[in-house]
């Protein structure tokens, strides 16, 4: 499904930030998407970086940053030059939803990701009692917080892979549009 890199010079590179609380399933879904197989992950201390090519002309460099409390303090350092944000929510961990929502709201205030498209992945949909994508949209105030950007909430299951491709395809479309509008803006300023 994914490849390490593209040999096609026409391929554009996009930087994607993959965030969420610890144990939300970020690394599991990244490697499920990239390798299309189950792997055992351990909590990410620091970050993982992988390139995924879902379309011939766009390669995503995905920065999977650890979600432990001490790592969240440095999330902002990874925001510069970001073309897309994927925020992963454990839809079954109702005790930490408020904390996750606060972190989501905090990262959206970072100046470097202003107008950057967002896909929320409502993970662990295979578990009983998982909140729906609609529940997550409402609880995370996505319509209000993301009114200045493209956004989408995708239900998924990192273990089975269900919903991952759809969520990342949506992100890819948003990223292309964002990069084009940013490129048009840069071209305008170079001319004037």
Curated annotation (Swiss-Prot):
GTP binds at residues 20-27, 64-68, 123-126. Expressed in immature dendritic cells. One of its GO terms (cellular component) is cytoplasm. Keywords: Cytoplasmic vesicle, GTP-binding, Lipoprotein, Myristate, Nucleotide-binding. It is found in: Cytoplasmic vesicle. SMART domains: ARF, RAB, SAR. It holds the Pfam family Arf. The keyword Lipoprotein applies. A lipid is attached at residue 2 (N-myristoyl glycine). One of its GO terms (molecular function) is GTP binding. One of its GO terms (biological process) is vesicle-mediated transport. GTPase that recruits MYO1E to MHC class II-containing vesicles via the effector protein ARL14EP and hence controls the movement of these vesicles along the actin cytoskeleton in dendritic cells. Interacts with ARL14EP. Belongs to the small GTPase superfamily. Arf family. This is ADP-ribosylation factor-like protein 14. The gene is ARL14.
